[in-house]
Amino acid sequence: GLALNVSRDGGRTFQAIGDMHGDHHALWIDPDNPNFLVNGNDGGVVVSYDQGRNWREFLDNLPVVQFFNASFDMDTPFRVYGSIQDHGSRRAVVDLSRGRDRIPAQAFQNAPGGEGSRHAIDPRNPNVVYSAGFYHNINRADVSSVDARGRAQSVSITPRLGPADGYLRGQWLSPIVMSVHNPDVLYFGGQYVFRSWNRG
C-alpha cells in the first residue's frame, strides 16, 4: 500500500515515515500540539506523540473493520456476507426472531471471496454463494461444508475469452448479479458484460 510521507522543507522533498499498515485515508494533527497525530489507514488507527517518528497501533485493541458491501441470503434466520478491507470476506447469522431491537451478537465466519469481493446467494439454496473478487476472479462455493480453516469448497467460474478478445479485465469490486427471473443466470461486469445461463 501507499506509505505515509512528510515534508519538512515546504514540499521540496518527502520522506516515508512510520512502520505501519499502508493505504492511508485520514490524518489528524492536533492544532494545539503538532506532535500528536492520529492516522486512519486500511489496518485501523495509529497514533504518534512525536510528529510521526514512532507510532502506536491499535489493531488488536479496537474491534473495527471497514466493510465494502453487504449481501444476504433468503433463509430464516438469514446470513449476511461482506468483504472487509484487508481482512477477506466474512459472514454471520442475523436472527430477528426476538425482534429487530434484540438481535444477538454473532461471531463472523470466513466467507468465499477476498477483501474486494461482491457476493450473490442462490435464493433456492442459501449454501450456494457466488463471489466476484478483485480483478475478475469469480467462484461458486458450497458453504455447507468448510475445511479446518473455515474455507468453503469452491470452483472457479471466471469467464474465458477467445484469443482475439485479449485479457479479461475487471474492476477492484467487479459486479456479479444473479437474475431475479432465473437464479441459474448470472451477469458479470468486466470490459464486457458476461452472461452465464448455467450457474457459471
Task: Walk through the language-model features, giving the residues of each.
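Beta-propeller blade termini and top-face loops
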Residues: 1-200
